[in-house]
Amino acid sequence: MSPDLLGALLVAAGYLAGSIPFGVVLGRLVLGVDVRTVGSGNIGATNVARAGGKKMGVLVLVLDAAKAIVPILVARRVLAGTPHAEVWVTAVAVAAFVGHLFPVWLGFKGGKGVATGLGIFAVLAPWAALAGLVGYAVAYGLTRISSVGSLTGTTLCAAGGFATYGPRHPISWAGLAIALLIFLRHRENIRRLVRGEEKKV
């Protein structure tokens, strides 16, 4: 099998892995509810925490990050030493992220991508991920508003990716695209923030 065909298959697998809606699955199996019908209606960790407590929220956060981490690590191992390996690995990361946002299992209606994006940065740019976590903690600690923490952390992750790899590397641009998509998925949160109506968690 050619490296490019293998890379394409790994991208498809990354998308399918990213599409696994852990928030919905655990909500139904453990909490007995469809998290899409409670709170904000989002399938991510914050809304799961609203429905089932902080431990459930943390579990979903870890699993949503892992569904990007695992495909990236597999792609790195399988494609090691092949031409364009870094490009394909980056493509697998983006595919997992897109899978979370537009999961085939849920009619392409998914989450906002913060945890999955964090998983991507944790593997591809660990220092950027650390900066993002610190930024989230500080912003959330000051405001008690999850979206403020998420958007602050996302911005620092993307900036950290550029600082790590420079403007010519595919990971830098993938990180920027991921950040922009996260901001787009938070557009309603941003509107509520502007109006002073965003709820604290």
Curated annotation (Swiss-Prot):
Cell location: Cell inner membrane
Gene Ontology annotations for the cellular component aspect, listed alphabetically: plasma membrane
Keyword Glycoprotein among UniProt keywords: no
Molecular function via GO: acyl-phosphate glycerol-3-phosphate acyltransferase activity
BP-aspect Gene Ontology terms: phospholipid biosynthetic process
Membrane-topology descriptor: Multi-pass membrane protein
Protein keywords: Cell inner membrane, Cell membrane, Lipid biosynthesis, Lipid metabolism, Membrane, Phospholipid biosynthesis, Phospholipid metabolism, Transferase, Transmembrane, Transmembrane helix
Residue ranges of the TM segments: 5-25, 55-75, 88-108, 118-138, 164-184
Record keyword Translocase present: no
UniProt function note: Catalyzes the transfer of an acyl group from acyl-phosphate (acyl-PO(4)) to glycerol-3-phosphate (G3P) to form lysophosphatidic acid (LPA). This enzyme utilizes acyl-phosphate as fatty acyl donor, but not acyl-CoA or acyl-ACP.
Record-linked NCBIfam families: glycerol-3-phosphate 1-O-acyltransferase PlsY (TIGR00023)
Family: Belongs to the PlsY family.
Subunit structure: Probably interacts with PlsX.
Protein name as it appears in the record: Glycerol-3-phosphate acyltransferase
Organism annotation: Anaeromyxobacter sp. (strain K)
